[in-house]
Design a protein with these regions (language model features):
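Transmembrane helix irregularities
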Residues: 3-5, 158-159, 179
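Pore- or pathway-lining transmembrane helices of multi-pass membrane proteins that form conduits
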Residues: 11-17, 159-177
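Transmembrane alpha-helical segments in integral membrane proteins
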Residues: 57-71, 76, 146-163, 223-239
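Membrane-helix interface segments
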Residues: 7-8, 85-87, 91, 130, ...
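Secretory targeting signals
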Residues: 15-61, 91-158, 204-205, 209-219
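Helix-loop-helix units of permease transmembrane domains in multi-pass membrane transporters
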Residues: 66-98
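Terminal transmembrane helical anchor/hairpin motif
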Residues: 25-43, 166-243
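Aromatic- and glycine-rich beta-strand/loop motifs that create alpha-glucan
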Residues: 1-15
């Protein structure tokens, strides 16, 4: 993969920095030394917009940049000439995309912890850092984003022109927050991560131990959605160039 000299790595820092710094800074003004549940409040404040919009937006750009590394100078044809199947190449590229998603989640977690520690110490809040809570929700964001990036990658593969793939993916991301409030959310991968954070917000405000996010029937449906888009991307990758 020719991503060593690309601008993808700096890109994945932008969204976490923007959303965490703004979210923690706006909420920290209301903190007092007696404030409870500080970390969950900061996390939900930061993750809500991030999960619905900034994380998907950044992954759309990463998809296009990964695909664009091979479109210049007939790089895709040179790659397809290698003794490796098209399916294997497409799977390899999707694995790279997944790795960048994982990297961005790590960046989000690290930036959030640093910003949160600064905010709590500044406002003299003595609440312990709930690292397991943060790891659980970051892992949840990562897993629920997998069907979404599978759909993004399939669209990137199907549409050769970056403008078309970016435009279509953006059009699918934008109504995610609306679809999340309907029964159709379960079949709409672009809102999965945002719906997860919305459920955590519901649990936080209701102060209940009963999670609003139900694994079933979400998990089987998400696996089917992921499988369909992944299979589409794998089978269609490089098909036009091989004709």
């Amino acid at each position: 993969m020719k991503v060593k000299r690309s601008k993808i790595v700096p890109l994945i820092f932008i969204a976490p920095l923007l959303v965490v710094v703004s979210g923690v800074a706006s909420l920290s003004n209301y903190f007092t030394p007696e404030y409870t549940n500080t970390w969950p409040a900061m996390f939900i404040q930061s993750a809500l917009v991030y999960a619905y919009y900034l994380l998907p937006f950044s992954m759309i750009v990463v998809c296009v940049m990964i695909a664009g590394r091979e479109t210049g100078n007939n790089g895709i044809l040179k790659m397809l000439a290698l003794p490796v199947s098209r399916c294997a190449l497409s799977i390899a590229k999707f694995c790279v995309l997944t790795f960048y998603l994982f990297m961005e989640m790590v960046v989000f977690l690290v930036v959030f912890v640093i910003a949160g520690l600064i905010a709590t110490q500044t406002m003299e809040v003595t609440e312990t850092l709930p690292i397991l809570y943060l790891l659980k929700w970051c892992l949840g964001l990562f897993l629920t984003m997998l069907p979404c990036i599978a759909a993004m990658w399939a669209i990137t593969v199907l549409f050769e022109k970056p403008l078309l793939s970016v435009g279509l993916n953006l059009l699918l991301v934008i109504p995610g927050v609306l679809v999340a409030n309907t029964p159709l959310w379960i079949a709409y991968p672009y809102c999965y991560s945002g719906y997860l954070v919305s459920c955590s917000l519901h649990d936080f405000t209701a102060e209940t131990s009963d999670a609003a996010f139900s694994v079933f029937p979400f998990l089987p449906c998400a696996i089917v959605v992921f499988g369909l888009f992944f299979a589409l991307a794998v089978t269609q990758f490089g098909k036009k160039e091989m004709r």
